[in-house]
Curated annotation (Swiss-Prot):
Record PROSITE patterns: SHMT
Official protein name in the record: Serine hydroxymethyltransferase
Location(s), subcellular: Cytoplasm
Pathway(s) where this gene product acts: One-carbon metabolism; tetrahydrofolate interconversion; Amino-acid biosynthesis; glycine biosynthesis; glycine from L-serine: step 1/1
Subunit record text: Homodimer.
EC number: 2.1.2.1
Family of the protein in this entry: Belongs to the SHMT family.
Length: 417
C-alpha cells in the first residue's frame, strides 16, 4: 500500500532542494522569456493527480485498454473546450508538445521530399518550420520566406516564392515576430497554388483566445499550438481545424496516434482542460489585453532610450531588441541581465553577423510579468533598468543596483500569493 503522507522532502532531499530553489528563483527573478509563463495551481493540481497512472492508447470511446471511462470524460472536456475557445470543429489534445503537434501535421499532409514554404528561422520562424537542423529541414524541401526592410512579413516575396516553387504546404506562425500576420492573405496565396495552409500559433494562442490577435483557425486548413506560453496552461500541444473535412481529421488523428505517439499523458490533458476553461473566463481577456499593453509600454521606453526594435514596435506579447552596431552581443546582454535577476534569451536578428550561439539581439516577452500583476508603470520602470544595464553591461555596480530594485519589485508582486 502506498501511504498518502509519502513526500519528496523526507525521501529525496537533493531533489526537494532543487525544486525549492527553482520555486524561489521564479519568485525572485523577473521572467521575460517570451515563451514562458506561470500556470495556475489548478493546472498543477490536475498534473499531480492519479490520472498519471492511466494508460489510454486511442481516443475517447475507441481505446485499446479497459478502464478508460473517466479519462474519456477528461479528454472530451479538453477537446470540447479547445474547440469552443478557438472556433474549431476539430481538436486533438494528445500531442506532448508543440513540436510533436507540428510533426503530426507534416506526417498527415506530406510525403518526405515534398516542398514546404516556411518562415526563415533567422527572420522569426521556428525550428520546426524548416530549419536544416530539425526533422522538417531534413525530410522536406524547404523554401524560406522572410521579412522586408521594415521588419514586416514580405507577402510579395511569399507569393513570388509560392508561385515559383509550388509548395504542397505553406506555414504561418513564428517564434520571434512582433507584428500581425495576415492569415487571410496567406490563405489566398495558398489557394492560388493549391497548397495546404498550416499555421503554428503557439506564441499567440492566448492572445487569439482572448480576441486581441487575429484568429487563424477560420483561414487555415490546420492550426497547431502549444498549451503553455501565452495560453498559460501545462506544457503540451494541440491540433485544431475548422476545415469541415472528416478525411483530414482522420489523417491528423492517425498521425498523432499511432503515427508519432503511444499513450497520451492523461494528467497533462486534464491540465489542458483546466487551462482551456480558465481561458474562457472574462478575466482572461483582461489579462491578455494587458500583456499587449505592457509590451507596447516596454517598446516605448526602449525606443526613447535609443534601442532598435525589429519591426519598429509590437502588436503582440514580444519584441526583439536589435543590438547590431553596439559593443554588446546578445549572449553578453543575456548574461548581464541574468546577473540582475532579469531573465531574457539571446536571439538572432535579421541579417545577424554573429552565430546563433552568440547573436546580436535579445527576445523579450510580457506574459509572465503580466501574470504576476505588472501593468504599464511597472513595465516601463523595468525597461528603464534593462536599458541601464545594456548601456553599461560590464559595470557591476549598475547590475547590483538593478538587482536590488528587481528583488523589491518581485516582493511587491509575488507569482503565487
Amino acid at each position: 500500500m502506498l501511504k498518502k503522507d509519502m513526500n519528496i522532502a523526507d525521501y529525496d532531499p537533493e531533489l526537494f532542494n532543487a525544486i525549492q530553489n527553482e520555486t524561489l528563483r521564479q519568485e525572485e527573478h523577473i521572467e521575460l522569456i517570451a515563451s514562458e509563463n506561470y500556470t495556475s495551481p489548478r493546472v498543477m493540481e490536475a498534473q499531480g493527480s492519479q490520472l498519471t497512472n492511466k494508460y489510454a492508447e486511442g481516443y475517447p470511446g475507441k481505446r485499446y485498454y479497459g478502464g478508460c471511462e473517466y479519462v474519456d470524460v477528461v479528454e472530451t472536456l479538453a477537446i470540447e473546450r479547445a474547440k469552443e475557445l478557438f472556433g474549431a470543429t476539430y481538436a486533438n489534445v494528445q500531442p506532448h508538445s508543440g513540436s510533436q503537434a507540428n510533426s503530426a501535421v507534416y506526417m498527415a499532409l506530406l510525403k518526405p521530399g515534398d516542398t514546404v514554404l516556411g518562415m526563415n528561422l533567422a527572420h522569426g520562424g521556428h525550428l520546426t518550420h524548416g530549419s536544416p537542423v530539425n526533422f522538417s529541414g531534413k525530410l522536406y524541401n524547404i523554401i524560406p520566406y522572410g521579412i522586408d526592410e521594415s521588419g514586416k512579413i514580405d507577402y510579395d516575396e511569399m507569393e513570388r516564392l509560392a508561385v515559383e516553387h509550388k509548395p504542397k504546404m505553406m506555414i504561418g506562425g513564428f517564434s520571434a515576430y512582433s507584428g500581425i500576420v495576415d492569415w487571410a492573405k496567406m490563405r489566398e496565396i495558398a489557394d492560388k497554388i493549391g497548397a495546404y495552409l498550416f499555421v503554428d500559433m503557439a506564441h499567440v494562442a492566448g492572445l487569439i483566445a482572448a480576441g486581441v490577435y487575429p484568429n487563424p483557425v477560420p483561414h487555415a486548413h490546420v492550426v497547431t499550438s502549444t498549451t503553455h506560453k501565452t495560453l498559460a496552461g501545462p506544457r503540451g500541444g494541440v491540433i485544431l481545424s475548422a476545415a469541415d473535412d472528416e478525411d483530414l481529421y482522420k489523417k491528423l488523428n492517425s498521425a498523432v496516434f499511432p503515427g508519432g505517439q503511444g499513450g497520451p499523458l492523461m494528467h497533462v490533458i486534464a491540465g489542458k482542460a483546466v487551462a482551456f476553461k480558465e481561458a474562457l473566463e472574462p478575466e482572461f481577456k483582461v489579462y491578455q489585453q494587458q500583456v499587449v499593453n505592457n509590451a507596447k509600454a516596454m517598446v516605448e521606453v526602449f525606443l526613447e532610450r535609443g534601442y532598435k526594435i525589429v519591426s519598429g514596435g509590437t502588436s503582440n506579447h514580444l519584441m526583439l531588441v536589435d543590438l547590431i552596431g553596439r559593443d554588446l552581443t546578445g549572449k553578453e546582454a543575456d548574461a548581464a541581465l541574468g546577473s540582475a535577476n532579469i531573465t531574457v534569451n539571446k536571439n538572432s536578428v535579421p541579417n545577424d553577423p554573429r552565430s546563433p550561439f552568440v547573436t546580436s539581439g535579445v527576445r523579450i516577452g510580457t506574459p509572465a510579468i503580466t501574470r504576476r500583476g505588472f501593468k504599464e508603470a511597472e513595465s516601463k520602470e523595468l525597461t528603464g533598468w534593462i536599458c541601464d544595464i545594456l548601456d553599461d553591461a560590464s559595470n557591476p555596480a549598475v547590475i547590483e543596483r538593478v538587482k536590488g530594485q528587481v528583488l523589491a519589485l518581485c516582493a511587491r508582486f509575488p507569482v503565487y500569493g
